Each structure stands twice: as C-alpha cells, then as structure tokens.
C-alpha cells in the first residue's frame, strides 16, 4: 500500500485537474454562448429599432399628408369654392362657346372617373403640359377613390357632376334628384368644391336627370367634338374624331374612367401637341363660358372706342 500511495495521490490530482478543466470548458462555453446570444439580441434589437423608426417616419409622412389635405379641404369648404358659371348659362344646355374664329381656345373634358388605372395617368400628362381641364365625375367613384378626386382639384382642374351611378334608363323625379344631388354632395364633402356643372351619362337628355339639373340651375355641359374613345378605337382614329369637329370655343369629350382607357392615355400627348401646333390654348369649361359671356362686351367696347371722333391734328 505504501508503494501505491504516490500513484493514488497522482491519480487524484489528475482527476481533479480533469474535472477543473471540464468545469472551465463548460464555463467558457456558457460564457461564449451568452455573449453570442447577447450579440444576436443586440443586432436584432438594432434592426427592430431601425424598422420601428422607418415605420414611424412613414406614419408621420402619411399623417402630414392627411393633415394637409384635411386643412385644404376645410379651407375650401369654409371659403365655399365653387365652379360657378355666368348666370345666362345656368339651367341651360351648352355644347360649345360662341367665339370668333380667331379666338382659338378649346376645353378638354374627361368623363366617368375617378378611375384607379387611368385618372392619375391623365392628370400626369396634363400636369406635364401645364393644361387645366374639366372632369365630370361619377359619385360612387368619388366615394371609392377620394384621393383621386382630391388630386383633380389640387392640380387645378375643374370637377363637375356626372350622376351617382351613371345610369341611362329613365328615372322618376326622386331618383333623378338622388343621382344629381348626392353626387354634388360627395364632391363637396371630398374636395370642398361646390359644382354647378352637370353632364348627363351618354348625353341622354330624356331620362329625367337633365330636367332635374336644369330646374336646379346647373349648366348642362354637352360637347362639340366626340373622341368616341369609349369604343377603344385605334389611336389615329380617336385623334381624327376629335379634330374632325374641333373649332374655337369647342368642348372635347374623352374618358378617364369606366373601363380600359389606355388608348386615350396614349393619344392624349399627341392630341395636345396637334392642338398647340394649330395655335390653340386650353381652358376649363367655366373659363370658356366666361369668355363667351365677356366677349360681346369686349367687342362693343372696342367698337365704341374705334367710333370715337378723332381730334384734328394741329397744323
């Protein structure tokens, strides 16, 4: 036993060392794992903070946008912005302005919007070319796409009434009143604009809505030049339809809603360029009617000036 004592002591020491080494290894593993976990947590935390910051920034931008639109809308409603027309056009049907041939102005009009796939594209083209137009909107579309209706107005265009459902069939007085009055109301609530311009769907003059509009002092706006773009004609034909009847004081009918308007969008830049090459300027329907209203006075004024006796020249 005496001879085995040093061996046992050595064995005990080795076992202790092995045990201590194992303990240290386990401790290091735990420490390393803990540090790795902390690093992962820290990395994840940074990413989460970045995502949260981006979300908050986006939310602030959206809130700012809403506040700006709301502020503008409230101001518009408070001031009672309106698309008034001269009194002699109220309750009457207008298809063009009676202007002399040298007064080369024309009004582009768009029906059946706002429409998600096309109205914004039409607005982009008009904005690029610095043109103001008139949009005859459908009430239920204004309700479904209020941001597009607001953009029509904030881009400086005239917004007008094209009934709530775009129905063609005959309507009793109550239904006709609903179609027109509710559309005027949703336009006002959405954009702050009170409109006194109306266009009947399909140009139907006998289904009851025009009678209601006239009796309530709306100017019933028809057209003098029809693109027939609702038939999805080839672009050259569509353009030819417009220019076949185009003339000073004319009102051009096109569509930004109610279906596939890709041909209209494709044709619009060429239509604009062609009118400009012919010396035309673009105006809204209210501007066009104002010109007709004022033109006789201007003619009379200029005629009076020209008829004034000239003072004889001093010798």
State each model region's role:
Residues 70-171, 175, 179, 184-186, ...:
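Active-site beta->alpha N-cap acidic-glycine motif
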Residues 116, 142-146, 206, 274, ...:
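Short, structured coil/loop segments at alpha-helix boundaries
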Residues 16-19, 31, 77, 88, ...:
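Generic detector of intrinsically disordered, low-complexity, polar/charged segments
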Residues 23, 114, 140, 162, ...:
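Gly/Ser/Thr-rich helix-start
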Residues 121, 147, 166-281, 285-302:
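Catalytic domains of cell-wall/extracellular-matrix polysaccharide-remodeling enzymes
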Residues 2-108, 115-122, 128, 270-271, ...:
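N-terminal pre-catalytic segment of deacetylase/amide-hydrolase enzymes
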């Amino acid at each position: 036993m005496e001879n085995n004592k040093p061996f046992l002591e050595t064995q005990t020491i080795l076992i202790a060392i092995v045990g201590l080494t194992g303990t240290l290894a386990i401790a290091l593993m735990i420490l390393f794992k803990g540090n790795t976990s902390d690093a992962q947590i820290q990395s994840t935390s940074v990413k989460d903070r970045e995502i949260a910051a981006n979300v908050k920034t986006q939310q602030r931008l959206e809130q700012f946008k809403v506040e700006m639109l709301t502020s503008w809308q409230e101001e518009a409603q408070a001031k009672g912005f309106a698309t008034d027309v001269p009194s002699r056009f109220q309750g009457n049907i207008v298809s063009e302005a009676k202007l002399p041939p040298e007064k080369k102005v024309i009004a582009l009009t768009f029906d059946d919007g706002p429409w998600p796939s096309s109205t914004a594209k039409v607005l982009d083209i008009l904005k690029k070319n610095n043109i103001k137009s008139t949009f005859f909107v459908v009430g239920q579309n204004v309700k479904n796409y209020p941001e597009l209706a607001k953009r029509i107005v904030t881009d400086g265009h005239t917004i007008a009434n094209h009934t709530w459902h775009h129905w063609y069939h005959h309507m009793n007085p109550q239904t006709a009143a609903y179609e027109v009055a509710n559309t005027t109301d949703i336009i006002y609530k959405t954009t702050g604009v009170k409109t006194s311009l109306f266009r009947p769907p399909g140009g139907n003059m006998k289904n009851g809505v025009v009678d209601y509009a006239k009796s309530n002092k709306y100017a019933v706006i028809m057209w003098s030049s029809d693109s027939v773009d609702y038939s999805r004609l080839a672009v050259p034909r569509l353009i030819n339809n417009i220019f076949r009847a185009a003339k000073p004081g004319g009102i051009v009918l096109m569509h930004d809603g109610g279906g596939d308007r890709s041909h209209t969008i494709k044709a619009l830049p060429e239509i604009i360029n062609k009118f400009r090459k012919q010396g035309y300027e673009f105006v809204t329907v209210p501007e066009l009617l104002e010109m007709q209203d004022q033109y006789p006075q201007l003619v009379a004024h200029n005629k009076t000036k020209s008829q004034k006796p000239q003072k004889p020249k001093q010798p």
